[in-house]
Amino acid sequence: MIVLPIKSEEAVPWIMQKHYAKRLPSISYAFGLYKEKKLVGIITYGIPASNSLCEGICGKEYKEFVIELNRLCLLDNAKNQSSYLVANSIKLLPKPKIVVSYADTAQGHVGYVYQATNFLFRGTTKERTDMSAGEGKHSRHATDPSIRQFRSAKHRYVYFHGNKTEKKLLQRKLNYDVLPYPKGETKQYNSGGKVETQALLFV
């Protein structure tokens, strides 16, 4: 297996067909997992929608380093493919970066892929309702306060990508306690979606 950069457009069919959210996030970086020259998975990273989130992790001074691992889609979720894709795509990101990601409890996700790749666990968000902008749109685009959308609890993970000095500095600046990993049964979901995969001509 090999992880390579791909165009963000190549990730779109995977996100819309294979990911449960069915919504396009902000994409700054996209990478593909190739097995025998066939694209079998994608991962994307983008700027978080919440500026307060970016400022809150390590402070305003480091908010520009924050990036969210916002989509991870695999063709068949074969053993170790998800952790391999996460670990090796992070290596391709510029340094330093503060990588955040979430495991949605409503989807039965615990975040074992993040635990396997040495992310730090920083707690769980509370269930809440937000203003809704309609299906497939982020709540930041909402304008009608009477239209509400349920937000499930999510496990929050963070990873510091950089050299030893940068990683130590960022971890010291972390404004959250590092907590023991959550445990529980992970549910597998099948979106039923299909994507046409492109063969890699040259490796």
Residue ranges and their predicted role:
Residues 146-169:
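A conserved mid-domain beta-alpha-beta active-site/ligand-binding segment of alpha/beta enzyme cores
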Residues 15, 28-45:
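Conserved beta-hairpin
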Residues 5, 46-149, 159:
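Acyl-donor binding region in acyl/amide transferases
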